[in-house]
Amino acid sequence: MEQFISHTGVGVPLRRSNVDTDQIIPAVYLKRVTRTGFEDGLFARWREDPDFVLNQDTYKNGSILVAGPDFGTGSSREHAAWALMDYGFRVVISARFADIFRGNAGKNGLVAAQMTEEDIELIWKLLDEQPGRTMTVDLEERTVTVGDAVFGFDIDDHTRWRLMEGLDDIALTLRNEDAITQYEKSRSPFMPRTI
């Protein structure tokens, strides 16, 4: 997983609340056996509408999604985080995330930055004033900067640390490789190996 310290990219205003994982990536797109190639399924039903925000040239290279509250609700689909990342998003900002989406995002390198609804409304206003505007998300400082405006966001300390270190579950486990190896050496040879 790639380290995330800060990212500057085009902000995409998604003025929708209660965006569940089936809206993020419909079930028909979940048939792949790999973790990549899900970008075509991202918001597939909504992208049928030519006026949908991701169909606008201004936002085609967007990498920071600014969504309404209750993002990522519904069933547990790690594919939702994969689809967002495959499309090019590095950050999703919302007032509330489903716990399971927040966990899946962090484990896959996608920042789920939680802010107040009032701050999100202000960011949407700034993005409307200048479509295609860039924003900066600084994970170290826990800030989002749009022009001269700076907003704070919440993210739990452990997820923040993992993202800044670039540690997925496997890399996190391998930090204990010496202890695991010592444990394996202490086990009877007839017992199965754990790694």
From Swiss-Prot:
GO terms for biological process: L-leucine biosynthetic process. This is 3-isopropylmalate dehydratase small subunit. Belongs to the LeuD family. LeuD type 1 subfamily. Catalyzes the isomerization between 2-isopropylmalate and 3-isopropylmalate, via the formation of 2-isopropylmaleate. One of its GO terms (molecular function) is 3-isopropylmalate dehydratase activity. It catalyses: (2R,3S)-3-isopropylmalate = (2S)-2-isopropylmalate. CDD domains: IPMI_Swivel. NCBIfam families: leuD (TIGR00171), PRK01641.1 (NF002458). GO terms for cellular component: 3-isopropylmalate dehydratase complex. InterPro entries: 3-IsopropMal_deHydase_ssu, Aconitase/3IPM_dehydase_swvl, AconitaseA/IPMdHydase_ssu_swvl, IPMI_Swivel, LeuD. Heterodimer of LeuC and LeuD. Pathway: Amino-acid biosynthesis; L-leucine biosynthesis; L-leucine from 3-methyl-2-oxobutanoate: step 2/4. Its EC number is 4.2.1.33. SUPFAM superfamilies: LeuD/IlvD-like. Keywords: Amino-acid biosynthesis, Branched-chain amino acid biosynthesis, Leucine biosynthesis, Lyase.
